[in-house]
A protein has these predicted regions:
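Catalytic cores of the polymerase beta-like nucleotidyltransferase superfamily
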Residues: 2-487
Length: 487
């Protein structure tokens, strides 16, 4: 019997417009016996409805009133058990996405790889997913060796597509809650909160993993990582965020399979980077990415620079900058991907700058060229949108201008729209010894002075000998037309 006394659908799985027969289901990537679940009654767990978003409760109750199964699922259940306020509330149901849209006027269907319903309540979005089943690794027409083959798939292609590396490109095969469990990544994320009696359904000992603060993949780890290499990044993210340890079988394949990240679409990796580095645990995420050999597949230029002694300080600067970013997030202060990618790519920019620093061009022009080269290469791994890439380059281009402290033009930097981010970057450089601490102190003090005193100070100051040199580089000597060099 299925849930709520309905006949079970084992072996009969909704597959878009058709059904899989019992014989066809033999090819499904499911265990021979689907799991039975443990029911943890309300009296034996700590989750209260008062801790659940009222909008999530509205979605759960309306689905149930319409005759559908509805569960709060995933990270929200895990976090509530840990006493953490969830950032998002996700719902799992046997209602199809189109059914959900009919129930909620404020619903939008999104996604192609995974078809989802987003129910909007002002700024809050409750994500509703239909129970999914595993399926045979059949390739849909349009698949190719191209790691970005997802873009070539047509809307009327089959509901599931897998590339030659085993990566799932699209997956819209619906099933039962018992099958849905096996589509989730970690046991700790596979707990279902039942709105009917406020119990928790546990199919894979997820509650025990939460108590032990342990991350364990559901199924064979290598197969699961090949299905979706981003699961390796999720393992790092949850370990960093929650302080969980990776179960040995879950941990072992990561370094060996890290190259699979090279086949993940660059736009998706951008989103994953924001989750890793802009959620309050970026410094620990970075350390774990390095430990498991993942960072070099996200930021290969930076990883190569960090391995060289002249740029080791850039790694220290990144770790310090991530720690400061974490502190700002935990204090509810704003952060921006612009600053994040500046510190992530600074070592690579310095290396590129120094490799080009033999010609007659001014340092500032070389810095611009180095930024462009590094950004162009990085886009093949992580698609940084122009709205962040352009201001990131401006932030780095402003660094030499901090050396100009004499003359009235020095004050113009204070009015630049990127001044604040560039100033914070200067402070970070000074903190790790890349910039002169006295320079950072001067720019800190000048901001506190009235305009008249600012003008008097810059007019009275003699020209600095290091004016206009690029950040982290020695000042080059320019040659006279006759061949003699001058400073």
């Amino acid at each position: 019997m299925g849930c709520y006394g309905r006949p079970g659908r084992r072996g009969l799985v909704v597959y878009g417009p058709k059904f899989l027969t019992q014989a066809e289901s033999l090819f499904l990537n499911l265990p021979s016996t689907l799991p039975t679940h443990i029911v943890i009654p309300r009296s034996e767990h700590s989750i209260s409805r008062s801790a659940i978003s009222p909008n999530a409760l509205k979605v759960l109750y309306r689905l149930r009133e319409a005759g559908y199964e509805a569960f709060l699922v995933g990270g929200a259940v895990r976090d509530l058990l840990l006493g953490i306020t969830p950032k998002d509330f996700d719902v799992a149901t046997n209602a199809l996405p189109e059914d959900v849209r009919r129930l909620f006027r404020n619903c939008r269907l999104i996604g192609r790889r995974f078809r989802l319903a987003h129910v909007h309540f002002g700024s809050e979005i409750i994500e509703v997913a239909t129970f999914r089943a595993a399926a045979a690794p059949e390739r849909a027409e349009g698949d190719s060796e191209d790691p970005d083959a997802e873009a070539s798939l047509t809307e009327d292609a089959e509901d599931r597509a897998i590339d030659t590396r085993g990566r799932i490109l699209r997956d819209n095969i619906y099933g039962t809650i018992e099958e849905d469990v096996w589509r989730r990544d970690f046991a700790a994320n596979a707990l279902y909160y039942n709105i009917d009696d406020f119990s928790i359904w546990d199919f894979v000992d997820g509650a025990a993993d939460v108590r032990a603060r342990r991350l364990k993949l559901i199924g064979e780890p290598e197969d699961r990582y090949r299905e979706d290499p981003v699961r390796m990044l999720r393992a790092v993210r949850f370990a960093a965020k929650l302080g969980f340890t990776l179960e040995p079988a879950t941990e072992e394949p990561i370094r060996r399979l890290a190259p699979l990240l090279d086949g993940v679409p660059a736009a998706r990796l951008f989103d994953e980077c924001l989750k890793l580095f802009l959620a309050g645990f970026g410094a620990q995420s970075f350390r774990l990415l390095e430990r498991y050999g993942l960072f070099e597949h996200l930021f290969p230029q930076s990883a190569a620079a960090f391995a060289l002694a002249p740029y080791a300080y850039a790694r220290d600067m990144l770790e310090t900058g991530l720690a400061h970013t974490d502190a700002r997030i935990q204090a509810d202060k704003p952060v921006t991907p612009t600053f994040l990618f500046a510190i992530l790519l600074f070592g690579a920019v310095l290396r590129e700058l120094n490799e080009q620093n033999a010609g007659p061009s001014p340092d500032v022009a070389l810095l611009m060229q180095a930024c462009d080269v590094v950004l162009k290469r990085q886009q093949s791994r992580i698609a940084i949108p122009r709205r962040f890439a352009v201001p990131m380059r401006e932030l780095l281009m402003l660094q030499p201008r901090f050396n100009r402290r004499s003359g009235i033009k020095a004050l113009g930097l204070l009015q630049h729209p990127r001044f604040r981010a560039a100033y914070d970057f200067l402070l970070l450089r000074a903190e790790v010894g890349i910039a002169d601490p006295e320079l950072a102190t001067w720019w800190t003090e000048i901001q506190t002075l009235p305009q008249e005193e600012r003008i008097a100070r810059v007019q009275a100051r003699p020209q600095d000998p290091a004016e206009a040199s690029a950040p982290g580089t020695r000042r080059r000597r320019r040659r006279r037309r006759g061949g003699a060099a001058r400073s």
